[in-house]
Structure formats: structure tokens, C-alpha cells
Amino acid sequence: MAEAAPQEAQQNFAIQRIFLKDVSFEAPNSPVIFQKEWNPDVKLDLDTQSRELGEGVYEVVLRLTVTVKNEEETAFLCEVQQGGIFTAEQMEAGQLAHCLGAFCPNILFPYARETISSLVVKGTFPQLNLAPVNFDALFMNYLQQQAQQGEAQA
């Protein structure tokens, strides 16, 4: 009888929960800003953070901050922290880093984008549709920067 080959542990990824962790909307120059011609200058800042909650369970938080200026005055400032709890088991360190730094933010981004769009409309500003973000490219840039910093310190 042939011996059974040892089974490798299977990778496991699952979404446990997606939640809104923090939200803020400010329109410091309203209502005066509504009387001006609308020619917005949009600035988007984003950041991701992750932490282990338990064995193979991680929280990932995507923070988006949108600042819109019109004629050099702040029309509105909107910040959303979209969180998710994910199961990520049996992954090598590099795979896990990519999962938490790119794959999970890709999952969270549409939720954060919709929240921002909704808040902007509720502030009676024209709808803001954020373009998709390539988190894979951002993650690769991050890895390259880390490698360059490591070489510079060596």
C-alpha cells in the first residue's frame, strides 16, 4: 500500500467583517463657498495599517482623506477609516504582507469611496467619484523604498 504524502497546510483567506471605524466631514467655509464658481482642486491622501488580532486574524484599516479647495479656500475635508477583519492563514511572510498591504485595501476601497461620495452629496457639494487605486503598485513601491533604505543604511 502506498504511503500517503504529507498534506501541506492549505492557505485560507476570508473576510470576517467590514466596518466603518471613523468618519469626519467638515465644510469650514460654507455657506459662502456655495456662492462661488465651482472649480475644485482635489487632494487625496491614503494610508493603510494592519495588526494581528489573534492567530491568523488581522485588522486592516484603510484611511482616506480628501481635501477639496475652491479658489484657494477649503470647500470640504472628508476623512474615512474603513476597517476590515480578515482571516489569513498558512501564508508565507511575503504573501501575508502583500495580502494585508494590497489585497485587503483593494477590498476596503470601494466601501470607503462610497462613504466619501455619500458624505460629499449630503454636504450639498457635487458628487465626488474617486478613481480606482492600484494598491498592488503602491505596495511594490513601498517594498522598493524599504529595500533602498536598507541599502543606504548598510
UniProtKB/Swiss-Prot annotation:
The keyword Cell division is annotated on this UniProt entry: no
Gene Ontology biological process terms from the UniProt entry: protein folding; protein tetramerization; protein transport
Compartment annotation: Cytoplasm
UniProt GO cellular component terms: cytoplasm
Gene3D superfamilies: SecB-like
Cross-referenced InterPro entries: SecB (IPR003708), SecB-like_sf (IPR035958)
Summary of the function given for this chain in its UniProt record: One of the proteins required for the normal export of preproteins out of the cell cytoplasm. It is a molecular chaperone that binds to a subset of precursor proteins, maintaining them in a translocation-competent state. It also specifically binds to its receptor SecA.
Record-stated family: Belongs to the SecB family.
Annotated protein name in UniProt: Protein-export protein SecB
Lineage: Bacteria, Pseudomonadati, Pseudomonadota, Gammaproteobacteria, Vibrionales
Encoding gene per record: secB
